[in-house]
């Protein structure tokens, strides 16, 4: 069977992290999201895997996924339905959205054995944010209702389908949606009127990485469930390690450092002297956390450096960021209300009382910079010394206030 991973989306909701990488390459501990998907497909015996990408990101995917077929979605039409039109299969195929993390392959291995079309559903606590599955009295799909104000159930579309080539007939029958996209779910709703579409409920951990703080959520789950304590690096005397801590190859932990797990320290990272890593610190690879730096519940990506006298809490920092001395990220409002973040032009609540900042790749801050809760700083931005960053900063912007 063929499998198609739909990864042509712009990743706008995950900005500024996606200013410099497709969302399929958001890291989960040491591996990008898409590598977990490919691994699970191969465990189910699927070898013919194609990733549907945008023309903008094709070169990035080809460089990173050398053994996987890469196909470009046409630029004139957006949406998951348009991505399927770029896929070519004559019999049947497995379709997976490229921004999903799921904890095991069991239901995928199950769904590909079915004779009929099928969709995987998953139960969530916030169904009105997703497409909700409506079932008939035989537990087959009746229809998918997108983001209903009053959801009929908490079983939602998990973004994993097994479809035969009839789907192309139904894609030809639908129109562009109100948001300007050709929607795969519209075609599936038509298909469900004519053919049985079986619903399989997913029972493991599932996460749609659709908002910047979901990067923290999924990494926390992975740290709790996918790895075990190990030390493959070099730890100097007078280092205190407490709880579950993973130290990868060529990492160096210098004297006076206190590490309170669970913590993940990626390959080639340098910690200390006298650093404090608190629970759910994830350092992806070749990071530097220097003297008198405290990090808590944050994902810090490849090559980023926080050399001295800084605090980072509940934040996501993309690759090759460098903080000047005394850079502080605040993660709690004075009124202790939930932190709001601008996502795709709308200011929404994160549902978190503690949330720091989201820093794009290659950002530089001067000394004594303060960044307020929920702020996003675009890739390649420069923050001048002494600035208090109280609003979002754009891609490449120089912020002086």
From Swiss-Prot:
Effect seen on changing residue 80 to A/G/Q: Increases both GlcNAc-1-P UTase and Glc-1-P UTase activities
Record's cofactor remark: Can also use Mg(2+) and Zn(2+), with lower efficiency. Important for nucleotidylyltransferase activity.
pH dependence, entry free text: Optimum pH is 8.5 for glucose-1-phosphate thymidylyltransferase activity.
Keyword vocabulary terms for this entry: Acyltransferase, Cobalt, Manganese, Multifunctional enzyme, Nucleotide-binding, Nucleotidyltransferase, Transferase
Keyword Transferase listed: yes
Signal peptide: none
Pathway(s) this gene product operates in, as recorded in its UniProt entry: Nucleotide-sugar biosynthesis; UDP-N-acetyl-alpha-D-glucosamine biosynthesis; N-acetyl-alpha-D-glucosamine 1-phosphate from alpha-D-glucosamine 6-phosphate (route II): step 2/2; Nucleotide-sugar biosynthesis; UDP-N-acetyl-alpha-D-glucosamine biosynthesis; UDP-N-acetyl-alpha-D-glucosamine from N-acetyl-alpha-D-glucosamine 1-phosphate: step 1/1
Stretches for region Nucleotidylyltransferase: 1-220
Catalysed reaction, written as an equation: dTTP + alpha-D-glucose 1-phosphate + H(+) = dTDP-alpha-D-glucose + diphosphate; alpha-D-glucose 1-phosphate + UTP + H(+) = UDP-alpha-D-glucose + diphosphate; N-acetyl-alpha-D-galactosamine 1-phosphate + UTP + H(+) = UDP-N-acetyl-alpha-D-galactosamine + diphosphate; N-acetyl-alpha-D-glucosamine 1-phosphate + UTP + H(+) = UDP-N-acetyl-alpha-D-glucosamine + diphosphate
Cofactor: Co(2+); Mn(2+)
Notes on temperature effects: Optimum temperature is 95 degrees Celsius for glucose-1-phosphate thymidylyltransferase activity.
GO terms of molecular function: glucosamine-1-phosphate N-acetyltransferase activity; glucose-1-phosphate thymidylyltransferase activity; nucleotide binding; UDP-N-acetylgalactosamine diphosphorylase activity; UDP-N-acetylglucosamine diphosphorylase activity; UTP:glucose-1-phosphate uridylyltransferase activity
Family: In the N-terminal section; belongs to the N-acetylglucosamine-1-phosphate uridyltransferase family. In the C-terminal section; belongs to the transferase hexapeptide repeat family.
Protein name per the record: Bifunctional sugar-1-phosphate nucleotidylyltransferase/acetyltransferase
Organism, scientific name: Sulfurisphaera tokodaii (strain DSM 16993 / JCM 10545 / NBRC 100140 / 7) (Sulfolobus tokodaii)
Lineage: Archaea, Thermoproteota, Thermoprotei, Sulfolobales, Sulfolobaceae
């Amino acid at each position: 069977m063929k499998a198609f991973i739909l990864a042509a989306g712009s990743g706008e909701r995950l900005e500024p992290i996606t200013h410099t990488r497709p969302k399929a390459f958001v890291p989960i501990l040491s591996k990008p999201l898409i590598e977990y998907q490919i691994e699970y497909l191969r465990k189910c015996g699927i070898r013919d895997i194609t990733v549907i990408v945008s023309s903008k990101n094709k070169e990035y995917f080809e460089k990173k996924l050398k053994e996987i077929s890469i196909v470009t979605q046409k630029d004139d039409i957006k949406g998951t339905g348009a991505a399927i039109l770029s896929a070519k299969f004559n019999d049947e195929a497995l379709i997976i959205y490229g921004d999903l993390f799921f904890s095991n392959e069991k239901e995928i291995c199950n769904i590909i054995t079915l004779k009929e079309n099928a969709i995987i559903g998953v139960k969530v606590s916030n169904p009105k944010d997703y497409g909700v599955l409506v079932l008939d009295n035989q537990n087959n799909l009746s229809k998918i209702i997108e983001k209903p104000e009053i959801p009929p159930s908490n079983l939602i579309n998990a973004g994993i389908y097994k479809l035969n080539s009839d789907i192309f007939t139904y894609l030809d029958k639908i129109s562009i949606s109100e948001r300007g996209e050709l929607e795969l779910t519209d075609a599936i709703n038509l298909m469900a009127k004519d053919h049985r579409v079986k619903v399989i409920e997913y029972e493991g951990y599932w996460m749609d990485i659709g908002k910047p703080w979901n990067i923290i959520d999924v990494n926390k789950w992975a740290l709790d469930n996918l790895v075990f304590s190990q030390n493959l690096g070099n730890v100097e005397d007078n280092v205190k390690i407490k709880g579950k801590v993973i130290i990868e190859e060529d990492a160096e932990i210098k004297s006076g450092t206190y590490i309170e797990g669970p913590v993940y320290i990626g390959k080639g990272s340098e910690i200390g002297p006298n650093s404090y890593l608190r629970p759910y610190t994830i350092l992806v690879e070749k990071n530097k956390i220097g003297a008198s730096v405290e990090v808590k519940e944050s994902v810090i990506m490849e090559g980023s450096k926080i050399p001295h006298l800084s605090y980072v809490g509940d934040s996501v920092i993309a690759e090759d960021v460098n903080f000047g001395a005394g850079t502080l990220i605040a993660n709690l409002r004075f009124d202790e209300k939930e932190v709001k973040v601008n996502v795709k032009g709308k200011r929404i609540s994160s549902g978190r009382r503690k949330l720091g900042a989201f820093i794009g790749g290659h950002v530089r801050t001067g000394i004594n910079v303060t960044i307020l809760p929920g702020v996003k700083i675009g890739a390649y931005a420069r923050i001048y010394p002494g600035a208090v960053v109280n609003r979002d900063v754009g891609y490449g912007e120089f912020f002086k206030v």
